[in-house]
Each structure stands twice: as structure tokens, then as C-alpha cells.
Amino acid sequence: MTNTELQIKNIVYEEFSKLISNIEGDFKTNFVKKRYNFLLSQLDETITANMVFVSSFESKSGFAIETCAKRIARLKFGDENVPTIVNPRNVKHNINPNTISGQNIVTDIDTDNGELRGNISTFRATNVAAGKGSSRSESGVTQTSIKTLLPMAQKYKASGYHTKPVDLAFFDGSDWVVLELKAGGDLDSSNAPANVEKLLTIYAGLNVPNSKAYFATLYNKNGEGNTWTGAVKKHMAFPEMFLIGKKFWNIILPDGIMYERFTELYKMALEELDLNSRINEMIRRTVK
């Protein structure tokens, strides 16, 4: 195992160790709450406890793996190119980066302005994909078309500074890249428009010409090698605006390490955590 591979395995180990400790900390409380749900009253307590774990793991693991992705991206691009405060235009601010979890963009554009948000919503809505099969036309939201949002957003510059959280942002040596990153592999159709508009607002607020925006997922819900069928495809051009599963990881993994090797390192880290034994013991203690 190379030093870089060891660093990646340790990142996964550290972040998932925090995750499991977090789940263990409030598991009993969450289990007791489920016991009051009469809809589950006929289920065995062990089944209920397993349901509680799965729900808790799915809701909390997203942050853990997103943190892993950020730390891994820093191995490839350098800490300075995956900053906590994303501020390529050097907007003046007084934010202490130590008070921020995750990443925030800093901008002099009022990203909460109603008119700006309305314009972005209109841009998305007028560029949705249409039709099916051979008659389908892809969304007009492309890396080229979104550049029209930059001069439009400059009309909403305001005094002081504004911040906007971003799932992942980095400078790859040529472009600033901002991502809406989903641990769950997709969004339902009702949430897709709002999430696309959030990403476009971040892109407009960043407001640098050498920038790109992507919708990304940690895995391909249709299976690697298969065409992804997510709801967001209606609102952004596919595949141009997407980094799905393997494609996402191969963008941020250090040179020489591919997605397949990363999944091996991930499994090694979770085996070292003795994840299954800890989960089973936690459930056993709770239902006894």
C-alpha cells in the first residue's frame, strides 16, 4: 500500500469512526421514539432497532462521506485549492475559517435577492429537457449557457459580503469547480428544481469566468457502467453537467488511484472499524 493509499484509508477510517460514535450516542433515544410508533408495534424489537440504525446511518453518513471527499480532494489539488472559504475574487470579509464546517463561498453578490433568484429559476425552467426517446431534447442548462448568469448576477452586487454553503468546491488548476453532491445517489423529482437552482445560485455568486458547476453523486444508483436515470436530468444537460459515481471519484482521487482501488480502501477501513460487530453489539445492548 502506498503512502497516498494509506492516507485515503485513514481518512475514511477517521470520518466513519466519528459517524459510528455519533450514531451510538443517540441510538437508544431514537429507538425509544420508534417504540411509541403504533404502526411498528407488531414488529420484533430487533427488527425495529435495525430499522432505526439504517435510518440513522443513511441520514448521517452523507456528511461523513462528503467530508471524506473534501479531504481526498485536498490530497490531489492541495489545501489551498480546496479552501474552507471559497473566495477567488478576494471579497473582503471577517470570517474565521475555524468556525465553519464544510465550505462556504464568499461573494459581494446578494444571493438572497428575490429578483436574482427569480431570474435563475426562470433560466432553469425555460431550459428543461423535453420529449422521450429519439425525440428527446436535452436540457439547455450547459457549461456554456450558465455563463450568461455571471453578468446578470453582477447587477445584484451589494455592500459588504454574503456567504453560501457549497457541498464541494475546488480549483483544478484551470477552473473553479462547484458541486451539488448527493450521498443518496439521486433526488426525487419534487426536489430536483430547487437543488439545481441552489447550485446555479452558488455558481452565479462565485462569479468567475473560469468556473464549472456539476451535479454529483457518490454512487451510480443504476450500477456502475449503466446509464444513470436521475430526475435532475430534466433540469441539466446530461452527461455534460453531471459527475456520477465512478466519474466523480476519479475526478478527485489523487493521480494513480482509480475508483476501483478507492472502494477497496473504503472496505478495508470499515473492516478495521469492525463496523458490523459494533452495530450488532449496539443493537443487542439496546433491545435486551
Where are these regions (language model features)?
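Nuclease-adjacent, charged terminal/linker segments that flank catalytic cores
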Residues: 1-95, 285-288
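Nucleic-acid nuclease catalytic cores
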Residues: 177, 203-234
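Active-site metal-binding core of divalent-cation-utilizing nuclease and nuclease-like domains
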Residues: 85-173
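Structural alpha-beta junctions
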Residues: 79-81, 204-212, 234-246
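Conserved catalytic cores of phosphodiester-cleaving nucleases, focusing on short active-site segments
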Residues: 73, 166-185
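Surface-exposed cleft-lining segments at the edges of enzyme active sites
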Residues: 54-56, 150-157, 182-190
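Mg2+/Mn2+-dependent nuclease catalytic core
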Residues: 184-207
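Non-catalytic C-terminal interaction segments of nucleic acid-processing enzymes
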Residues: 3-18, 228-288
